[in-house]
Design a protein with these regions (language model features):
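Non-catalytic C-terminal accessory region of glycerolipid acyltransferases
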Residues: 2-7, 26, 36-38, 49, ...
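Catalytic core of membrane glycerolipid acyltransferases/transacylases, capturing the structured
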Residues: 116-177, 200-207
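A conditional alpha-helix N-cap/helix-loop micro-motif detector
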Residues: 102-105, 129, 155, 173-176, ...
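Short, flexible loop segments at the rims of nucleotide/cofactor-binding pockets, characterized by
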Residues: 98-103, 151, 168-174, 212-213, ...
């Protein structure tokens, strides 16, 4: 069994390396076009991912016609393909090239600089929206390196390869399994911490708050960190602007923290506010969110399953 596992891991790593190196050898525009093409092909294939996406879109947009939902789901797959193409280019990216490729939102920049001036930590409240791998990478290219929470991949060799790319310009990955102490240190030292806030979680590590009008089990960790460190929480994401042919690093004003003196209530209220901020960004760029994730999988006790 162990031998089979080692062989399987080696094959997975070899395949991942071939794909990334093959795309990485292409000019950026070609690699991205190939990636988008792969995404379009994946959209056409029947399977659980498409069914999950369709179900999620029914929940989020109950009044939307089927044709428009199909357009958004196709965009989701295309965005994933774009992510693959762009990620393959990061090993050879330079700060100069990235600055030409990215437009930074002045709102997000202003609040980031203000927090830095006041020596306050910053939490980038983000999610699987647009090209999230480029998001953290792009900030480090602008000389704002950050730490970010990750769940390591099961294949250690692929994880090492991916982490080398992610951390080229000074970013630092923090394993979610042991994140609390390191995350607190980053924020208390005035650093920036990126957290993907839009994943389904379990009740022991989250709370149920509305997301697109339906309760979703959402991580309580962001609220806990923000309340303990008085960090500035900035909703932000990296999305493709088709008209400008550039990426736009969207930034909203910080989410104001609520403090009532009731810890449990503060966690729930602030988590709900963070989820609402994430929802607003998804509504702005609905064809670039990860609709194929089972966001509403965990249900309150006694409620029927969704998927």
């Amino acid at each position: 069994m162990a031998k089979h596992s080692r062989l399987q891991s080696a094959l997975e790593y070899s395949l991942a390396r071939v794909i990334l190196c093959s795309l990485g050898a292409l000019p950026r525009c070609v690699a991205v076009s190939v990636g988008v093409g792969i995404g379009r092909l994946a959209y056409l294939l029947p399977g659980n991912l498409s069914r999950t996406g369709q179900r999620n879109l029914e929940i989020a947009f109950p009044d939307m016609d089927q044709r428009e939902r199909a357009r958004l789901l196709r965009g989701c797959f295309e965005s994933l393909g774009r992510l693959l193409g762009e990620f393959s280019q990061l090993p050879k990216a330079t700060p100069e090239k990235l600055r030409r490729l990215i437009e930074y939102d002045e709102v997000g920049l202003r609040h980031l600089r203000e927090a830095e001036k006041n020596k306050r930590g910053v939490i980038f409240l983000t999610g699987h929206l647009g090209v999230w791998e480029l998001h953290s990478f792009g900030w480090s290219a602008l000389e704002y390196p950050l730490s970010f929470l990750v769940r390591p991949l099961d294949n250690e060799r692929i994880e090492e390869m991916v982490e080398r790319i992610r951390t080229r310009f000074g970013n630092r990955a923090i394993d979610k399994k042991s994140a609390a102490r390191q995350s607190l240190r980053v924020l208390r030292e005035g650093g920036t911490l990126g957290i993907l806030s839009d994943l389904n979680t379990q009740p022991y590590e989250g709370v149920f708050v509305p997301f697109f009008g339906k309760l979703a089990c959402t991580t309580a960790g962001i609220a806990t960190l923000a309340l303990k460190t008085d960090a500035v929480v900035i909703p932000t994401c990296a999305v493709w602007d088709r008209k400008k042919k550039r990426y736009f690093f969207h930034g909203d004003p910080p989410v104001e923290l609520v403090r009532t003196g009731d810890h449990a209530k503060d966690i729930e209220v602030n988590t709900a506010n963070f989820a609402a901020a994430m929802e607003r960004m998804v509504r702005l760029y609905p064809n670039q969110w990860l609709w194929i994730h089972k966001r509403w999988k965990t249900r309150p006790l006694g409620e029927a399953e969704i998927y």
